[in-house]
């Protein structure tokens, strides 16, 4: 109800996610007031109603292949987004539980990844830029080692994460903040009138870019540190709580 009421008052509601458009839950995209989406960590901004792409920022093919080669030094599975679909080596998908202890993550990956026999060969044969590369780690210390090493070795790659054991690798100019600013310009909305909600490191640039930034109650400490407000958790409808208190009742931000 809070989202619907906000939309009725003229606010534009936009999901901003690391997922591709088709991987956003159906019950979200079925909301009648949703038109625009920021997806794949800002690699793409879409008009879901017309199918128009408003912004695109992708990894060069050579960079993607080098990232996959680099990932081979870690005990990690990797996949990629190309053409708005997640692709993964079949062998990795068959061992998805080895790399992911969280059953929700296992279910998500199985639902949203298309298996191929050899992902690198598949990407090379397509010969096109890739939207994102993702790594999932069994060992969290190794994840932090990989974060530092990839950041140092690939200055043209932005390294973020959205759940406990992953790293998400995008083009350095693909981030939710740049996407938010581009969409605001497209819609003629002053940036100071934008509000962003987030809980993970892939939300940081968006939260810094927005006129008002709100951390979810379950947000990582580095996310809370950059935000103007902290609301309740995802599971306790923190977005709705903030909207009711600060937006629907006309409280000045």
Question: What residues fall within each predicted segment?
Answer:
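Mg2+-dependent phosphoryl-transfer enzymes with acidic/Ser/Thr/Gly-rich catalytic loops
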Residues: 152, 167-253
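Active-site phosphate-binding/coordination module
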Residues: 1-103
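Alpha-helix termination/capping residues and helix-transition junctions
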Residues: 30-31, 127, 188, 224
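Conserved acidic, metal-coordinating active-site core of Asp-based
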Residues: 70, 74-77, 81-197
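Short, acidic loop-to-helix structural element flanking the phosphoryl-transfer center
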Residues: 1-11, 56-63, 115-120, 171-185, ...
